[in-house]
Structure formats: structure tokens, C-alpha cells
A protein has these predicted regions:
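Conserved active-site alpha-helix within GNAT-family acetyltransferase domains
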Residues: 93-107, 207, 230-248
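Acyl-donor-binding surface of acyltransferase catalytic domains
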Residues: 55-125, 253
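Conserved acetyl-CoA-binding loop-helix of GNAT-fold acetyltransferases
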Residues: 69-81, 196, 202-218, 236-241
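Conserved donor-binding loop and adjoining core beta-sheet/short helix segment
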Residues: 26-79, 177-192
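Conserved beta-strand-loop-alpha-helix junction that forms the acyl-donor binding cleft
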Residues: 89-96, 226-236, 252-261
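A mid-sequence, solvent-exposed acidic-amphipathic segment
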Residues: 135-190, 195
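Short amphipathic alpha-helix that is part of the acyltransferase structural core
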Residues: 1-23, 117-152
Length: 261
């Protein structure tokens, strides 16, 4: 049986089966994000066996399709309820479920990574040039991302988390590290929207911002993850240097409903 799910405890205990695979699911249970979520569940003898999340808090919705042996069945059951266009994170092979109704723009294979802790020499290192960013700087931050990371998932409400750090030189933002998900209640965070201005790359600014962000998160959060494209070698080196290890691979794409005339 397929039905929408709103029971936070049920969703949480299901998602704990693989905390880093379902990191967004867990973090989005926080009241800060939950009102933007639609959860589709597959039940077998009243037991939740599969779960798909549609997050509508961004300009373009994002669908998260990860699961187990019956996830394809659940996806087929809900496909007529999905938006006309959305980003999708999914297990390899599930793209075929969309192709009869949607056009696909494939973004490639990505890697989920999990945090094991900063190396000892970085745990207490401080960077005077890296500061916390606030909502007062929204305009400058949006301008920075438009130039440096136009495909970012950043929305200004994310600054309310207090987990965005940046380097500013001559009144211009040069680098930012932030979060996609952050919940003290559910003890989880997912790093994201990490970028550096083209003119400042190779100077270690992203590393500085990521370390500063992790130092802040370590005091509050037990489980920290991130997503990165598998062929982004520079980013992979940065994350490995700052305490992340691979967890599993998945795919990303943009889907747009086919138009028939």
C-alpha cells in the first residue's frame, strides 16, 4: 500500500537504517524544513518499507529516491503525482522509471561522504579571515553565487541556520562554505553551497571556510555528510583532507515532463 507519511518518528526510525544515505530525510524532519516536505511511503503489513521525499523549499523541487528492493515499485506508484520539473537524487538504474513521462538532463554520478573528524592539527586552528555570514549580507551572497556557482541550491532562508562562513576581501565575498541541511534536534548536518570566486581559487580559501564550518558543527552535531561529484578531484581532495570518507555513489539529474502536441 502506498500513502503519504507525516509521522516524524516513523520517518526517523526508517531513515536511521542508513544515516548518511538518508541524511536529507533526517535533517528535513526539523521544523525548519519539514513544512516543505512531502513523504511517500510504501507499506507492507503496516510496516514502512520504502520512502521517497519531495522537497519543495527551493525554487525548483528536489526528489530523493533512495531505498531498497521495492523502491522502483514505489516510484512507479507516485510518478503521476510528481511536479512537471524537478531535480532528482536517485539510485543508479531508477532513471528508467521516469523516461516514459519525463525528459532527462543528466548531471552525473555523485558521491555521498561521511565525516570522521578533523585531523588533530586542524581541530583548533583558527582563521582570522573567515567570518560567519548573516542575512544582512544576502544581496552580496546571491551575487557571489550567481558569478561563482550559478547552479547552486542556495536559498536565502538557509542563512537562518547560522552555518554559513565566508572570506571577504575588499568588501567582496571570495569563498563560502555552508549547509544544505542542519538540525540540532536530529543531530545531523549536510554541507553544501561550497564555492570560491574564480579569481581566488588555488589559495586555500575553500579549505579555510570548510574547516571553520566543521569546527562550528562539531560542537553541536554528531553526523555530518556531504555530496560531491565523483570527477571533482579538487573538491574530493579537500573533503578527504578535512576528515570525510566515501559512503556510496548515487546519480543526479533534472527531469522535465514531456510535452505532447
Amino acid at each position: 500500500m502506498v500513502q503519504k507519511v507525516s509521522d516524524k518518528q516513523l520517518i526517523y526510525y526508517f531513515s536511521k537504517k542508513d544515516i548518511y544515505l538518508f541524511a536529507y530525510h533526517i535533517g528535513d524532519l526539523d521544523d525548519f524544513f519539514f513544512h516543505n516536505c512531502t513523504w511517500y511511503g510504501l507499506f507492507d503489513n503496516d510496516q514502512l518499507t520504502e520512502l521517497i521525499l519531495l522537497f519543495s523549499g527551493l525554487s525548483t523541487p528536489t526528489l530523493l529516491v533512495f531505498g531498497f528492493s521495492k523502491i522502483s515499485m514505489l516510484l512507479d506508484e507516485i510518478i503521476d503525482d510528481l511536479p512537471d520539473r524537478f531535480y532528482c537524487h536517485y539510485t543508479k538504474g531508477l532513471e528508467k522509471n521516469f523516461l516514459s513521462k519525463y525528459e532527462m538532463d543528466y548531471f552525473g554520478t555523485h558521491l555521498k561522504m561521511k565525516y570522521q573528524g578533523l585531523p588533530k592539527e586542524l581541530r583548533v586552528k583558527k582563521f582570522s579571515n573567515c567570518t560567519q555570514l548573516t542575512e544582512k549580507q544576502t544581496g552580496e551572497i546571491l551575487t557571489f553565487y550567481e558569478k561563482s556557482y550559478p547552479n547552486t541550491y542556495f536559498e536565502s532562508f538557509m542563512l537562518k541556520t547560522g552555518k554559513y562562513y565566508g572570506i571577504i576581501e575588499n568588501n567582496l565575498i571570495k569563498s563560502i562554505a555552508g549547509v544544505h541541511v542542519y538540525s540540532k534536534k536530529y543531530n545531523i548536518a549536510v554541507l553544501g553551497n561550497i564555492a570560491t570566486d574564480l579569481s581566488s581559487r588555488g589559495l586555500g580559501y575553500a579549505t579555510t571556510c570548510v574547516i571553520t564550518l566543521l569546527q562550528s558543527l562539531e560542537a553541536e552535531i554528531k553526523h555530518i555528510g556531504l555530496n560531491v561529484k565523483v570527477d571533482n578531484i579538487a573538491a574530493l581532495k579537500l573533503y578527504q583532507k578535512t576528515g570525510f570518507v566515501p559512503h556510496l555513489e548515487y546519480e543526479e539529474a533534472f527531469f522535465k515532463k514531456k510535452q505532447y502536441f
